[in-house]
């Protein structure tokens, strides 16, 4: 896919990974990925710098086919190490090594690059949170930032690879932010410092990506997460100036590394926990959650995004949570639009960041529409609670003289509301929300093809998209359709293949299916640790040799940072102590698995010895039986023929001289 964009100047425009830091990583990771000692030879299919250069530069068709075959073998090996079919679990899975290998393989152009990035995105989506993943996550983060800042900046057009890199970067920094909340980034300051030049360059990408919210939203999330982490972990070393949310950090204990979460995020995690545990306190929690809905208007919108992600996961299982989610966002959009409509500019809060929250909400709605537990939840996310015929009949509000009132924030209601306010100079929240809805509807329609049970839902989405395509003249919204089609790598028109069954791309993940649940589960353990967790020993996680990223650097002591989550109205849960991840029981399970495996191997050896003894005894008995049988035959022969010679044996003759 290529679309014209205006690229901004970036730093370090040399091609490939060529810095001394990456040169060292080549050597270190190749030794680790091959799994061989120094005296053993590397397998023929290991990734090398020469292999990547030959793959991209060769003109010989025969050699190109051989290299492609080798790359496909590596792809198969990586799929197994990533555990794509087992959600990243199993004895054969080693995520840090696989992530590093896949990000190297993604430098091979063509189908190998696309499949590698698809695999990496799927793995980062469903993998669990493990402290041992951090070195590999930082390496993937630096590689993605390098590609976005250097390789992408040299291109005149927008490529589908940029979209995939931005999505991967979003997942990586989302994971890093969760580790930051656990206090696990204190010993990774050098890793954070290495990201600063690339983050600085990425901060100038607004001119390149502002027309494409699906990319720009991911970029803004990366920058915001890095800014917050940098303020807390790097202090003066960060390239970001602490100009925002100074009061947010003044009321926390800087010596203890405190980070104040807002009430909305806390209650969203509590609501998710209630849904998971089928708690009768859910309604009370949701009442308090709606009471704190104004916290969604806080300038530190990263907490708001996390809150919506967690509440969206609860909404996939519970209708009351879905209603609370829609009510909170409805109030947020109404408040933002009322502020933007005020003519008085004095002392009006700056909501230039609000479009990020609105766009991510459209993604959450799309995921609910696809992956909710019941058909009622999926239908409600699309149509809403009113079930009005007008909402189904007038999908696009063509008469803009009387703008409709925003009664709820389902997909069709928001589509009607934003389309009525579209203009060339409309607010960014309006056209970004409209863009996100159309962009995600195309992907939903593509995802639902072939699913007969969802035909009614897909028919309504198809009609909506058809009207948008026919009547919407705004170039930005037309771009949403074109980019979504190109991202799906689908050369055909989705509006002309309604009755055609077409298989989806192998390994292509349209939406992130599991990361929201992983985050909700992790934050629930962080905010509401079980009572027995307070008696767990505070151990330092060990750092393995094969996960040491820098051989010339001394290992720093992994001193865990204790965060204090300040929730003023809940003193009982303030200052919750953090414990290293993974916890005691996870480690105990791993040790138990090792013990079981050890005893199983010993039992296999004993069985092999017993089998060998049995086979030897059987062979001995067989030979003895043959010997006895032969002696019996000779005895009968002697009795009948009075001969002692063996059958067919001539008697001995003395030669007469």
From Swiss-Prot:
What protein name applies here?
Answer: Transmembrane protein 232
- Extract the PANTHER family matched here: TRANSMEMBRANE PROTEIN 232 (PTHR28651:SF1)
- Record Pfam families: TMEM232
Give the species.
Homo sapiens (Human)
GO biological process terms, alphabetically, are:
cell projection organization; flagellated sperm motility; maintenance of protein complex location; spermatid cytoplasm removal during spermiation of flagellated sperm; spermatogenesis
Query: What keywords were assigned to this record?
Result: Cilium biogenesis/degradation, Membrane, Transmembrane, Transmembrane helix
Q: What is the membrane topology listed in the Swiss-Prot or TrEMBL record?
A: Multi-pass membrane protein
On whether Transmembrane is a keyword of this UniProt record, the answer is: yes
The primary site where this protein sits is membrane
Q: Spell out where the chain crosses the membrane.
A: 168-188, 353-373
Q: Name one GO cellular component term.
A: membrane
Record localization = Membrane
Protein's job: Plays a critical role for male fertility and sperm motility by regulating sperm cytoplasm removal and maintaining axoneme integrity.
């Amino acid at each position: 896919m290529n679309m014209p964009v205006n690229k901004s100047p970036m730093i370090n425009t040399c091609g490939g990974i060529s810095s001394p830091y990456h040169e060292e990583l080549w050597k270190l990771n190749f030794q680790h990925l091959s799994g061989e000692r120094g005296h053993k030879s590397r397998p023929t299919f290991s990734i090398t710098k020469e292999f990547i250069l030959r793959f991209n530069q060769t003109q010989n068709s025969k050699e190109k086919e051989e290299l492609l075959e080798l790359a496909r073998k590596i792809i198969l090996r990586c799929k197994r190490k990533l555990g794509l079919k087992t959600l990243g679990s199993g004895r054969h899975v080693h995520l840090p090594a696989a992530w590093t290998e896949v990000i190297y393989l993604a430098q091979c152009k063509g189908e190998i690059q696309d499949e590698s990035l698809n695999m990496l995105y799927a793995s980062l989506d469903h993998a669990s949170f493990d402290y041992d993943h951090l070195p590999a996550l930082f390496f993937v983060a630096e590689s993605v930032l390098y590609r976005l800042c250097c390789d992408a900046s040299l291109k005149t057009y927008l490529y589908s690879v940029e979209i995939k890199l931005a999505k991967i970067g979003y997942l990586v920094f989302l994971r890093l932010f969760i580790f930051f909340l656990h206090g696990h980034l204190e010993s990774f300051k050098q890793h954070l410092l290495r990201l600063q030049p690339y983050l600085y360059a990425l901060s100038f990408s607004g001119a390149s990506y502002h027309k494409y919210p699906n990319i720009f939203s991911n970029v803004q999330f990366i920058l915001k997460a890095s800014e917050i982490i940098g303020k807390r972990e790097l202090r003066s070393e960060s390239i970001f100036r602490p100009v925002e949310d100074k009061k947010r950090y003044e009321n926390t204990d800087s010596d203890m590394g405190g980070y104040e979460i807002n009430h909305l995020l806390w209650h969203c995690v509590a609501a998710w926990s209630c849904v998971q545990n089928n708690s009768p306190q859910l309604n009370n929690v949701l009442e308090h959650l709606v009471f704190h809905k104004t916290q969604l208007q806080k300038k530190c919108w990263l907490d708001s995004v996390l809150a919506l992600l967690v509440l969206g996961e609860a909404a996939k299982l519970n209708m009351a949570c879905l209603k609370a989610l829609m009510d909170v966002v409805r109030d947020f959009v109404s408040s933002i639009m009322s502020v933007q409509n005020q003519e008085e500019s004095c002392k009006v809060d700056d909501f230039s960041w609000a479009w990020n929250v609105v766009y991510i909400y459209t993604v959450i709605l799309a995921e609910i529409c696809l992956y909710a537990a019941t058909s009622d939840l999926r239908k409600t996310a699309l149509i809403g609670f009113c079930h009005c015929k007008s909402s189904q009949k007038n999908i696009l509000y063509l008469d803009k003289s009387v703008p409709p009132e925003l009664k709820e924030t389902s997909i069709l209601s928001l589509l009607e509301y934003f389309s009525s306010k579209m203009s060339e100079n409309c607010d960014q929240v309006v056209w970004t929300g409209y863009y996100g809805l159309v962009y995600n509807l195309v992907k939903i329609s593509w995802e639902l093809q072939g699913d007969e049970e969802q035909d009614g839902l897909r028919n309504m989405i198809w009609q909506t998209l058809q009207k948008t395509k026919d009547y919407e003249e705004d170039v930005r919204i037309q771009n949403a359709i074109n980019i979504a089609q190109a991202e799906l790598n689908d050369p055909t028109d989705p509006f002309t293949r309604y009755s055609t069954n077409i298989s989806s791309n192998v390994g292509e993940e349209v939406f992130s299916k599991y990361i929201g649940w992983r985050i909700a589960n992790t934050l629930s353990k962080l905010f509401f640790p079980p009572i027995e967790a307070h008696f767990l020993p505070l151990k330092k996680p060990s750092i393995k040799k094969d996960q040491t990223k820098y051989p010339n650097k001394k290992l720093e002591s992994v001193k865990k940072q204790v965060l204090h989550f300040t929730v003023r109205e809940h003193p009982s849960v303030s200052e919750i102590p953090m414990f290293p991840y993974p916890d005691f029981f996870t480690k105990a399970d791993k040790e138990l698995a090792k013990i079981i495996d050890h005893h199983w191997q010993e039992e296999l050896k004993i069985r092999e010895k017993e089998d060998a003894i049995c086979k030897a005894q059987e062979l001995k008995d067989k030979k003895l039986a043959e010997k006895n049988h032969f002696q019996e035959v000779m005895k009968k022969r002697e009795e009948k023929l009075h001969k002692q010679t063996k059958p067919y044996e001539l008697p001995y003759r003395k030669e007469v001289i």
